[in-house]
């Protein structure tokens, strides 16, 4: 019997509980979890800033996490490329994905005769630092006007 493969993707810059929630959710739906790590260049284009942690380091960190079986870097030219190579049974999307984005993904994959189940993590983890941006804001708040003691 073939292994059921799930894929999820993200920047995974500053790890927080939301990342772990998504990875654990994904692993519950498959035998093997492959994580696609957004490339530094792609993140800069989309978010207007480079990740704090370089892509190769983010890949190594994600690969070391218990639910993750394998991590790969995303494509610089075609966001579907790693998905088409992996051919997952399930794609896990984060809570910030819209219905439009989900329908667009289904449509794009169907053009390649790929029809995975697409599941969405429905809610955000409720905690003070549930996003990388919140972590960065807190670091700035605590340290921007103080001398760093190294």
UniProtKB/Swiss-Prot annotation:
This is FAD synthase. The keyword Flavoprotein applies. Gene3D superfamilies: HUPs (3.40.50.620). It holds the Pfam family CTP_transf_like. It comes from the Archaea. GO terms for molecular function: ATP binding; FMN adenylyltransferase activity. Catalyzes the transfer of the AMP portion of ATP to flavin mononucleotide (FMN) to produce flavin adenine dinucleotide (FAD) coenzyme. Belongs to the archaeal FAD synthase family. It is an enzyme of class 2 (transferase). Its EC number is 2.7.7.2. It catalyses: FMN + ATP + H(+) = FAD + diphosphate. ATP binds at residues 11-12, 16-19, 96, 124.
């Amino acid at each position: 019997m073939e292994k059921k493969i799930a894929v999820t993707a993200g920047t995974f810059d500053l790890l927080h509980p939301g990342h772990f929630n998504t990875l654990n959710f994904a692993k519950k739906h498959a035998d093997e979890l492959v994580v696609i790590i957004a490339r530094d260049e792609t993140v800069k284009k989309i978010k207007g800033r480079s990740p704090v942690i370089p892509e190769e380091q983010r890949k190594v960190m994600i690969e070391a996490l218990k639910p993750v079986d394998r991590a790969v870097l995303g494509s610089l030219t075609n966001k579907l490329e790693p998905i088409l190579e992996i051919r997952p049974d399930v794609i896990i999307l984060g809570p910030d994905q819209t219905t439009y984005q989900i329908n667009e993904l289904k449509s794009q994959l169907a053009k390649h005769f790929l029809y995975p189940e697409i599941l969405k993590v429905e809610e955000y983890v409720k905690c003070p630092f549930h996003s990388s941006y919140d972590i960065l804001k807190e670091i700035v708040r605590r340290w921007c006007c103080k001398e760093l003691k190294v």
